[in-house]
Amino acid sequence: MTQAILETEKGTIRLQFFDNDAPNTVANFVKLSQDGFYDGLTFHRVIPGFMSQGGCPHGTGTGGPGYKIPCEINDNPHLAGTLSMAHAGRNTGGSQFFICHEPQPHLDGVHTTFGQTEDDESLKVVRSLRNGDRILSVKIVTDAA
């Protein structure tokens, strides 16, 4: 089971990945995190009651890592706290992600869900984010069990 600890200006967001349901998307996020890609980036698009989006190196929603990854649509719904891959059309994701504030069933089957907040405190932090809040660091934790 793979996890991420996102340290933000507003607090800590603990995420548990859906390793089996979106293995390539998880591996991409893990690699970018381990390379320090997300460190210092902002949540550039926050819509209260909907979601917080980050992962754009330009801070505008127009950037990515320089490559695209295929969608891995799965049966995990977009619930409060769901981590999902942002994209500009099918198979155009890369580094941008969003975390839902509330259930968003209209996104099911459209975006790759690849994780979930681990606890209520993490979801509170997600909901407290505002445009421009920074990701300070992302630590990946792998449990070999």
UniProtKB/Swiss-Prot annotation:
Domain PPIase cyclophilin-type stretches: 1-145
Pfam families membership: Pro_isomerase
The keyword Isomerase appears for this protein: yes
PANTHER family linked to this entry: PEPTIDYL-PROLYL CIS-TRANS ISOMERASE-RELATED, PEPTIDYLPROLYL ISOMERASE DOMAIN AND WD REPEAT-CONTAINING PROTEIN 1
Any one Gene Ontology molecular-function term assigned to this protein's record: peptidyl-prolyl cis-trans isomerase activity
Family to which this protein belongs: Belongs to the cyclophilin-type PPIase family.
Enzyme Commission number: 5.2.1.8
Alphabetical UniProt keywords: Isomerase, Rotamase
InterPro entries from the UniProt entry: Cyclophilin-like_dom_sf, Cyclophilin-type_PPIase, Cyclophilin-type_PPIase_CS, Cyclophilin-type_PPIase_dom, Cyclophilin_A-like
GO BP terms: protein folding
Catalytic activity: [protein]-peptidylproline (omega=180) = [protein]-peptidylproline (omega=0)
Enzyme class, spelled out: isomerase
Reported function: PPIases accelerate the folding of proteins. It catalyzes the cis-trans isomerization of proline imidic peptide bonds in oligopeptides.
The organism of origin for this protein: Synechococcus elongatus (strain ATCC 33912 / PCC 7942 / FACHB-805)
Designated name of the protein: Peptidyl-prolyl cis-trans isomerase
